[in-house]
Amino acid sequence: MRNDKIAIGVDIGGTNIRAGAVSNDGGLIGESFSVSTNATERKELILSRIVDSISRIITQNKLSISDIQGIGLGCTGPLDVKKGLILECPNLPTMDYFPLRSEIEKAFNLPVFMNNDANAMMLGEASWGAGRGASSVLGITLGTGFGCAIILNQKIWMGATETAGEIWISPYGDGYIEEVVSAAGVCKLYEKLSGLKASSKQIAHLANEGDQFAKAVWEEFGKAVAFALSWSINLLDPEIVIIGGSISNAFELFYPSLYESLVKTICPVPAQNLKIVKAQLGDNAGFIGAAALVF
């Protein structure tokens, strides 16, 4: 039996399932594992992949059940966290109202902790990443969608109905802010300006190469993120703002317009101390954050 405390974290998205063993100081133990979710298949098959991912982490890293303190699940939502249910989830369309937590508990006879992927990821960043040591963290994830998490004293603030941080639905222009502050929004604006189709990753590359249309896209993107954050910063006065998700790889491209816009729209005192940083845990952030739910 090992002396250190270990949790298994699982990041469950519409595209991939990623799992890893994590120590209570945030260190990755051994190798992680990833498999395609195949989200349109039957729920039993998706559950089987989740269970198999956890089993592989245990066997390939030569762990025993007695070594493991618990299992953390960071899952695309919406969720009923108290009941451990996936609700009507567009990214997992065959798993509506599926009791995921209890199924994993039955499979391994271990405590299982579950939260949405944005909350889990930012708990990991607050515990072991860019927000380590901060008492209040506001985190956003930018990628396929727009997620937000509030971490106070190393605990996720869920709100009365478990929907704290759902700012993606904030009105913006003729629609919602997520329609702009997402990979699809980046691609749509670039096509509108240039007449060309490209992925968000390609648009970041083009901007770095000097493409004026691509640079304009990231400038507008930063302004939109600032709009979304300004209300939250004025309300919460967080010690640090962390930006993660796949689009955070373009952080240097949109940060200047984000910062410039924010300092004009938030209260003067927090504006003087504003700290906005890129997430640090990288591709492992999802399952490391899920493991943080256990400790």
Where are these regions (language model features)?
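ATP-binding/phosphotransfer module of carbohydrate and carboxylate kinases, centering on a glycine-rich
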Residues: 1-70, 79-85, 102-110, 127-134, ...
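Short beta-strand segments
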Residues: 11, 72-76, 115, 139-145, ...
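Short hydrophobic alpha-helix segments
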Residues: 32-33, 90, 160
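A short acidic/small-residue loop/turn micro-motif
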Residues: 36-38, 94-95, 163-166
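A charged helix-plus-loop insertion that forms the helical arch/lid used to bind
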Residues: 84-94
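Active-site nucleophile and cofactor-binding loops and adjacent substrate-binding regions
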Residues: 91-93, 113-119, 139-142, 277-283
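Conserved PLP phosphate-binding loop immediately N-terminal to the Schiff-base lysine helix
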Residues: 115-129
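Glycine-rich phosphate-binding loop of actin/hexokinase-like ATP-binding domains
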Residues: 130-184
